[in-house]
C-alpha cells in the first residue's frame, strides 16, 4: 500500500493544480469583463489625479443623500 501512495499523491496534487489553473484560465478568457478591466489597468500607470477622482466618487456613493 505505501508504494501506491508514493506515486499517487504527487500525481494527484499535480493533476489537481493543473485542473484549477485550467479552470481559472477558462474563466479569465471566457468572461468578457475581466479582460477589458485588466487591459485598461495595464495601459497606463495610476496617477494622483485618478486616485483623487476614485476617492471622490467612492465618498459620494457611500455618503450620498437619500434618494427621493
Swiss-Prot record:
Protein name: Small integral membrane protein 45
Tissue specificity of this protein: Highly expressed in brain.
Disulphide connectivity of cysteines: none
Coiled coil: none
Record function comment: Plays a role in the regulation of neuron maturation.
Keyword NAD: no
Any one of the GO BP annotations: neuron maturation
Topology within the bilayer: Single-pass membrane protein
Main location: nucleus
Organism: Homo sapiens
The gene coding this protein: SMIM45
Amino acid at each position: 500500500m505505501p508504494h501506491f501512495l508514493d506515486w499517487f499523491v504527487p500525481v494527484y496534487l499535480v493533476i489537481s493544480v493543473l485542473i484549477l489553473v485550467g479552470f481559472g484560465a477558462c474563466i479569465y478568457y471566457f468572461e468578457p469583463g475581466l479582460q477589458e478591466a485588466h487591459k485598461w489597468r495595464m495601459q497606463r500607470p495610476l496617477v494622483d489625479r485618478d486616485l483623487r477622482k476614485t476617492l471622490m466618487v467612492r465618498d459620494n456613493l457611500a455618503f450620498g443623500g437619500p434618494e427621493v
